[in-house]
Swiss-Prot record:
The gene is NFD6. This is Protein NUCLEAR FUSION DEFECTIVE 6, mitochondrial. GO terms for cellular component: mitochondrion. Required for karyogamy during female gametophyte development, when the two polar nuclei fuse to form the diploid central cell nucleus. The keyword Electron transport does not apply. Residues 1-29 form a transit peptide. InterPro entries: NFD6/NOXY2-like.
Amino acid sequence: MATSAVLSGARSMLRAASSRSAAASTGRFASQAKSAPPLFRATARRSPLLSPLRNPVELSFCVESLLPYHSATASALMTSKLSISGQTYGWLSDACNDDV
């Protein structure tokens, strides 16, 4: 019973010490963060080229131009496969066996 009391007392002392050291380190880092000058300053004046493009959807044309070339090929192939009429079989192997 005495050992459990000693252990619980030791735990509470460790918790108190760790919370004090955490509070001290947080305060130290907060004071350093406040005193450090910002690395990047936002300018109040924007570029005249980017001012009409405020919406990310409006910038989607840039993303499409960055797609790899195989995506354009795959897109064209998919479009051509989808445009096949419903009466043809397209690339199915069963369509090649006309003599059976």
